[in-house]
Amino acid sequence: MFRGQMFAVQRMGSALMHGGGGGTRIIGVAAARATAPTVGSSPSMASARFYHPKVIDHYTNPRNVGSLDKNLPNVGTGLVGAPACGDVMKLQIQVNDETGVIENVKFKTFGCGSAIASSSYMTELVRGKTLEDAAKIKNTEIARELSLPPVKLHCSMLAEDAIKAAIKDYQAKRPTTQLK
């Protein structure tokens, strides 16, 4: 719900329709940001003004959203969750069996802006990497790049856990492709 309103602010540029107690009126972007519900309107999320621009970019324009056919032998699926906050992340990789390189990657995440941004950023990191290199990615790299605050580090940990789970699933389908 709030995400659509954030998009409205960005798309409309200089004005936004605002339905207040006295009817609908057009207000400027600065006022729209002050009056329209932001990401921070949800108790599970920090206010948008506290997010780093890279988080907002990956949240509003997530890369590689979608699913791959989990039944394909060269697709690994990692499904992880954080019971503390309710975030759930599914990350899928499609691997070239001959080279061991991740050629395609998709994700679906139910969670806060930081979880979505961490998922999106992880997909960019792993595409084109070997399984061995992808398995070496640490949550600290994601957290540093996205400037996640300490309270959101679990989101980057989910992304690390998801890629490791996807690699493990791929390897379980193809037992001869274990990491060294």
Swiss-Prot record:
Binds 1 [2Fe-2S] cluster per subunit. The keyword Mitochondrion applies. Keywords: 2Fe-2S, Iron, Iron-sulfur, Metal-binding, Mitochondrion, Transit peptide. GO terms for biological process: iron-sulfur cluster assembly. GO terms for cellular component: mitochondrial matrix. Pathway: Cofactor biosynthesis; iron-sulfur cluster biosynthesis. Its main location: mitochondrion. GO terms for molecular function: 2 iron, 2 sulfur cluster binding; iron ion binding. It is found in: Mitochondrion matrix. Pfam families: NifU_N. Component of the core Fe-S cluster (ISC) assembly machinery. Scaffold protein for the de novo synthesis of iron-sulfur (Fe-S) clusters within mitochondria, which is required for maturation of both mitochondrial and cytoplasmic [2Fe-2S] and [4Fe-4S] proteins. First, a [2Fe-2S] cluster is transiently assembled on the scaffold protein ISU1. In a second step, the cluster is released from ISU1, transferred to a glutaredoxin, followed by the formation of mitochondrial [2Fe-2S] proteins, the synthesis of [4Fe-4S] clusters and their target-specific insertion into the recipient apoproteins. Belongs to the NifU family. This is Iron sulfur cluster assembly protein 1, mitochondrial.
